[in-house]
Amino acid sequence: MITLAVDCMGGDHGPGVTLPACRQFLEHHPDARLILVGGQDSLQGLVHERVTHVVASEVVTMDDAVEVALRRKKDSSMRVAIQQVKDGVAHAAISAGNTGALMAIARYLLKTLDGIDRPAIATQMPNAQGGATTVLDLGANVDCTAEHLLQFAVMGSALVSVLQDRDEPLVGLLNIGEEVIKGNDVIKKAGGLLRSAAKSGDLNFHGNVEGNDIFKGTVDIVVCDGFVGNVALKASEGVASMIAGALKQEFSRNIFTKIAAIVAYPVLSAIMKRMDHRRYNGAALLGLRGLVFKSHGSADALAFEQALIRAYDAARNNLLDRVRARVAHAAPLLAAADAQPAS
């Protein structure tokens, strides 16, 4: 039985989204239990034999500063949910709340794995191969060193190995060009570290990739700093929404375009389903000594259910142990990288 702790109060919509998503998730996963954390009255919206309610008196808002969430709101639904993981009561925690607060609280309570300096946020983006490309970091670390990018690559490889059943997932380093000479000093050094990792057998490194490679499916994993990754994620979601809106507008122009829309509906529906970012909701906070997943703050019930499913799959497939094992195997490489003088 897999047990997930859910921050029911987080995100833009709170229980209005999280509870319907939890109800739907339970219907499809008979071997799962949920610990719902939030206000007492709010939690009454979902009573189930495989649900436990844990009352929390505070809520971390989307505008709360990290210090407020971490130091002052010690009985927040977000913190109490993560505490369930620390105490061994839940296999994973899920929240749609404030990203900075979630990362800070998770790092404070769970700590990082040996050999990992900073956790990273990883999620999937759809690609032209009919699958998905895993990208990290997506906003946890705005500024990164080359050593951090190497650590992200190691953890991302473990994630893809577990969730996509790939023995040797292919890693790419996001850059402004494929050539080795391109990029800033951090990227150039990271490229060198990743090539060394490939030679030692710790990683399957493709080389530098560009932004379009994320969607072409050139590699399984794209590594970047959190600033670039977050911009790429939000830009892709914006483009997908723009395309959907443009198609709807054009097919609604007159009777003939409406008829064309009816004829083309099966194809258009399949395409839009592949591009629907809600299907890829649920980002893993990698590098912690416990499983924590972040949902979009604006997620609807369908999207939040996907985050629950990702957390469930990660727990069922022992993601934490496999990340820990891969990091331990790469420990000499990571230690050697940290020991190198700054360029």
UniProtKB/Swiss-Prot annotation:
BP GO annotations? fatty acid biosynthetic process; phospholipid biosynthetic process
Q: State the EC number(s).
A: 2.3.1.274
Identify a single GO molecular function assigned to this protein.
phosphate:acyl-[acyl carrier protein] acyltransferase activity
Matching Gene3D superfamilies: Isopropylmalate Dehydrogenase (3.40.718.10)
Record's keyword terms, sorted:
Cytoplasm, Lipid biosynthesis, Lipid metabolism, Phospholipid biosynthesis, Phospholipid metabolism, Transferase
| Ranges annotated as spanning the membrane | none
Q: Which positions make up the signal peptide?
A: none
Give the family per the record: Belongs to the PlsX family.
Q: What is this protein called?
A: Phosphate acyltransferase
Which species is this UniProt entry from?
Answer: Acidovorax sp. (strain JS42)
Its lineage reads: Bacteria, Pseudomonadati, Pseudomonadota, Betaproteobacteria, Burkholderiales
Gene name of the encoded protein: plsX
